[in-house]
Structures are given as structure tokens and as C-alpha cells.
Amino acid sequence: MYVKLCPGGVMHEHQDSGKRIHIILKTNPDAVMTIDGIEYRPELGGIYLMDVSLPHSSVNNGTTDRIHLVLL
């Protein structure tokens, strides 16, 4: 699935089950993911394995969209 976070967008802290792969298709320096209290700024083109059973959230304080391809 594609996950888009528009400028000013917030994905409030929540927990899911299992792990997911995030492929970063579009981002900016002000798009931040917080996982278990630690802030991350995933790099464009990066591929990340996330344990989504941990508390996580995202915020896009930038001026461009943040788009991830998420593989369940």
C-alpha cells in the first residue's frame, strides 16, 4: 500500500502487529517518524524493516508530500 503524509500531516502514535517494510519514495528533511520514542528521518530510496508492534507516529513539517510504499 502507498502511504502519503501531506505537508503539515500527522499520524498519531499507535501500535499495529508484526513487521512491515517501508520503501521511501518521496520525503523531505522535516518528515519525521518516531518509533518507540526515537526519531528517524528515513532517506529517499531507503528500505526499512519496521517493527510496528512498537508505538510509532509520523509528522510531516515539510512543504512537500512524504510517500512510502509499505509492504505488509
Describe each region flagged by the PLM:
Residues 1-7:
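A short glycine-rich, His/Asp/Glu-containing loop-to-beta-strand
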Residues 4, 15-31:
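Short, conserved beta-strand element in jelly-roll/cupin
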Residues 7-8, 45, 53:
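Tight coil/turn sites that cap or link beta-strands
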Residues 12-14, 31-33, 50-62:
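Short beta-strand His + acidic residue motifs that chelate non-heme Fe in jelly-roll/DSBH
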Residues 21-24, 47-49, 63-72:
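A short hydrophobic beta-strand segment most commonly corresponding to one strand
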Residues 24-44:
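A short beta-strand-loop-beta hairpin characteristic of the jelly-roll/cupin
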